[in-house]
Amino acid sequence: AGRNVHPIAVSGQFQLGGITVTTGSCGHAWGGVWFHLDVADGLFYSGDISMESALFRFDVPPPAGLALVDASYGLYNVSQRQQWDKLRARLTLPALCPVPPSGRAVELALLLAREGRTDIALDAPCLEMLRQMAAHNDGSLHQDVEAELQQLLRTLPAFSAQSSLILAADPDGQSGMAGELRRRKDFHHRTLFTGHMNRLNHQQWLAGEVDFCRWNVHPTLKTLMLLVSMLKCSRLVPMFTHVEDIQDWQFAPGCHIVTQNMLRVDLCH
């Protein structure tokens, strides 16, 4: 009560204290957006972004002089196509993939369905997200996937713990259906993480108890270079990463790399 809440469009504009804010689909997840503020020579804030998704679209942003950009993977530069070949090989044995319902759950199911896989099970939260996406594109999805999502929804088998491939929340693999299945003594699927692993998951991976194969949901170096070209930015702030040697990040002529500490000092003055 008393909150002044206004939903914003995935792709659109709104006014914030006299500043025009433009939004666009970020390519990372359902409903995810980037922000562009029409101030000075433009300020771009990416949030989580990806340009490699087969499901989620990435809207080209307006030019911006200063860009605060998702660099979660650092200078990692392995393409999604290469990762898909690796991941596909891991999915030949019974596997449980702990996934976020609004992100790669539906995308992985869609890609596997395109290859004729019919032994895929989605838990209730993942299936509900598929229903929402198949019913209405809020601007997050590529325009040509709606019919495929509807077909996938019609043909997916009922959830079963015996399915060869199970896509289930939560992505940490400790809660939700994924956590419940892993605690069952009669469940023997191999757990395969495709995204961020917390400390426990990382320890389990080092011990050989679980598998890991990254599914790109953040920018590779190639994507960062493409984004800088789109934005024509003169200053880039790599976020969600540790910049050890700033010289390694000077990958775009005319674009100065700014660390978050340097930016903080800049703003204070």
PLM feature segments, named:
Residues 208-234:
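His/Asp/Glu-enriched, well-ordered alpha-helical/loop segment
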Residues 80-147, 226-269:
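Binuclear metal-ion centers of metallo-dependent hydrolases, dominated by the metallo-beta-lactamase
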Residues 2-8, 18-21, 65-67, 138-151, ...:
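Active-site regions of enzymes building and remodeling cell-envelope glycoconjugates
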Residues 26-29, 47-49, 71-73, 100-102, ...:
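Active-site metal-binding loops of divalent metal-dependent hydrolases
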Residues 9-56, 151-181, 219-226, 263-269:
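Core dinuclear metal-dependent hydrolase active-site scaffold
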Residues 1-104, 110-119, 144:
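His/Asp/Glu-rich metal-coordinating catalytic cores
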Residues 60-63, 115, 181-188, 228-232:
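Short, conserved loop/helix-junction motifs that constitute active-site signature segments
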Residues 177-209:
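Redox- and metal-dependent alpha/beta enzyme cores, enriched for Fe-S-associated oxidoreductases
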